Each structure stands twice: as C-alpha cells, then as structure tokens.
Swiss-Prot record:
InterPro entries: RNA_pol_sigma_r3/r4-like, UPF0122, UPF0122_fam_protein, WH-like_DNA-bd_sf. This is UPF0122 protein LCA_0713. Disulfide bonds: none annotated. It holds the Pfam family UPF0122. Might take part in the signal recognition particle (SRP) pathway. This is inferred from the conservation of its genetic proximity to ftsY/ffh. May be a regulatory protein. Belongs to the UPF0122 family.
Amino acid sequence: MELAQNARMNSLFEFYGALLTAKQHSYLSLYYGDDFSLGEIAEEYQVSRQAVYDNIRRTEKILEGYEAKLHLFQNYEQQNASADALQKYIQAQYPNDQQLAKLLADLLNLTEQ
C-alpha cells in the first residue's frame, strides 16, 4: 500500500506541484522525490519533526483536492490506457499497415508530451 501511495503522490506532485507554495513543494520533493526522512527534513529546515509531518499531510490533502476537482492525473491514466488498447488492436488487426502505424506513433508521441 505504501508503495502505491508513494507512486500516486509522486504523480500528483508532477501534475500539481507548481500550484504549491515553495515550502510545500520543497518538503514534498525531499520526502517523496529524494526519500528524506521527516527527521532529515526537520533538521534541514530547523523545524520540528511534527511540523514537517503536518505540512506533508496537509499538502497531500491539497494535492488530492486538486485531483478531485481537475482530474488531470485520472484523465492522463485513461488516455494512456486507451492509447495502449488502440496500439494492441492495430498491431493485431493491421500489422502491415505502415501509414496507420505512423499515425499511431504520432498520436502516442502527442500523449507523452
């Protein structure tokens, strides 16, 4: 469960990190991105471990709130799933169609940007 939660927070951070304050951004970057402990972050910023914990939990709720309203991460996952399904279908049904393969590659490149 923790690994899935970490992956989700990293993804939400990628989508919504620019909307956070500098302190929120820094704490989450260190905690999830650089795998710092609460104690290490507290020492770095000369605050209590509890202050770091509270800030991180509050920021996680903020990120989840952004996702609940904007659905950017959910839409991204759905687009990727649809693109994967389309790619499998085209490869199975039209393996020799080079033009279709190129169009699909162009579409996949757009979804990755």
